Swiss-Prot record:
Taxonomic superkingdom: Bacteria
Species of origin: Buchnera aphidicola subsp. Acyrthosiphon pisum (strain APS) (Acyrthosiphon pisum symbiotic bacterium)
Pfam family name, one: Rhodanese
InterPro entries: Rhodanese-like_dom (IPR001763), Rhodanese-like_dom_sf (IPR036873)
Domain Rhodanese: 50-140
Protein name (database record): Uncharacterized protein BU052
Length: 144
């Protein structure tokens, strides 16, 4: 027991770092498990689209949307979501929603808004369209 106390007294910085890392890990794991929404990868998204008729909501700007988007996705810019202008997707409340986000720092606020509007099954496409393109999955390009 004296050896443990001696070790702790000589290595306070090391022990502090370990305690901080442990608390951070517990926090992030708990937050992930208790989160109402779920981060999904491309193949989970494809499965949701094909089997559960999930609706893809692309929150990027109209210009970015026209440069390339997932087939049958609906463009609702992030600012419209925060302003409550979501008439295009209100009829899809009973379907799973897959969000394509470009601003990852607004993820939690965006998800909160969707739950406020009555959407119960909200998923986030991990890394937006970046990995979708990396995996060479199809994109629709509008030049209009």
């Amino acid at each position: 027991m004296q050896d443990v106390i001696f070790f702790l007294s000589k290595h306070i910085l090391l022990i502090s770092i370990w305690i901080f890392c442990f608390i951070a890990a517990v926090f992030f794991i708990t937050r992930t498990l208790l989160s109402k929404s779920k981060m999904i990868n491309n193949f989970q998204a494809i499965k949701l689209i094909n089997q559960d008729k999930a609706i893809v909501v692309d929150t990027r700007s109209l210009e970015s949307f026209k440069e390339g988007h997932i087939l049958n996705s609906i463009n609702v810019p992030l600012k419209n979501i925060f302003l409550g202008k979501i008439k295009e997707i209100e009829i899809y409340k009973m379907f799973p929603i897959i969000l394509v986000l470009s601003d990852t720092y607004k993820v939690n606020a965006c998800i909160k808004k969707f739950f406020e509007y009555g959407f119960n099954r909200v998923y986030i496409l991990k890394n937006g369209l970046y990995y979708w393109k990396t995996d060479n999955l199809p994109l629709i390009v509008n030049d209009k």
